[in-house]
C-alpha cells in the first residue's frame, strides 16, 4: 500500500541538506517556480521549501504556496525518484491561482522524473 504522508523524514531540515542540493542540482523551472533536485542516498524523496518575503509579502500568501507544494509532493512522492528537492519561489508566483499552480507543479515533477530516468 502506498503511504501518502509527509513525515519528518521526507523533509530537508538543516542548512547542510539545503546546501547539498544547491551545489550541483538538476533544474526544472518556469518563470514563477524553480525546483532543484539532487540524488540522495536514501530510498525516498525529500522536500525543502524556500519562499522569500521578497516575492510574497504577506505570510498567508507564503503559507498558501508552501501548503500547496507540500500537498503536491505528498501525492506525488511514490512516483518521484530518491532525490532531495528544493522548491524555490520566484516573482509572479502570487498571481497564480491554486489550480494553475497545481498544474505547473505536476509538470515540473514529471520533468524531474524524466531527468532522473536519463541519468
Curated annotation (Swiss-Prot):
It catalyses: Endonucleolytic cleavage of RNA, removing 5'-extranucleotides from tRNA precursor. The keyword Cell membrane does not apply. GO terms for biological process: tRNA 5'-leader removal. It comes from the Bacteria. InterPro entries: Ribosomal_Su5_D2-typ_SF, Ribsml_uS5_D2-typ_fold_subgr, RNase_P, RNase_P_CS. One of its GO terms (molecular function) is ribonuclease P activity. Consists of a catalytic RNA component (M1 or rnpB) and a protein subunit. RNaseP catalyzes the removal of the 5'-leader sequence from pre-tRNA to produce the mature 5'-terminus. It can also cleave other RNA substrates such as 4.5S RNA. The protein component plays an auxiliary but essential role in vivo by binding to the 5'-leader sequence and broadening the substrate specificity of the ribozyme. This is Ribonuclease P protein component. It comes from Haemophilus influenzae (strain PittGG). The gene is rnpA.
Amino acid at each position: 500500500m502506498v503511504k501518502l504522508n509527509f513525515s519528518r523524514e521526507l523533509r530537508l531540515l538543516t542548512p547542510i541538506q539545503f546546501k547539498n542540493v544547491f551545489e550541483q542540482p538538476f533544474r526544472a523551472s518556469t518563470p514563477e517556480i524553480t525546483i532543484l533536485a539532487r540524488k540522495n542516498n536514501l530510498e525516498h524523496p525529500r522536500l525543502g521549501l524556500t519562499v522569500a518575503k521578497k516575492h510574497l509579502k504577506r505570510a498567508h500568501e507564503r503559507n498558501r504556496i508552501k501548503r500547496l507544494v507540500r500537498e503536491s509532493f505528498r501525492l506525488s512522492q511514490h512516483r518521484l525518484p530518491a532525490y532531495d528537492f528544493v522548491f524555490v519561489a520566484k516573482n509572479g508566483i502570487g498571481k497564480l491561482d491554486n489550480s494553475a499552480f497545481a498544474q505547473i507543479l505536476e509538470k515540473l515533477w514529471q520533468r524531474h522524473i524524466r531527468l532522473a530516468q536519463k541519468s
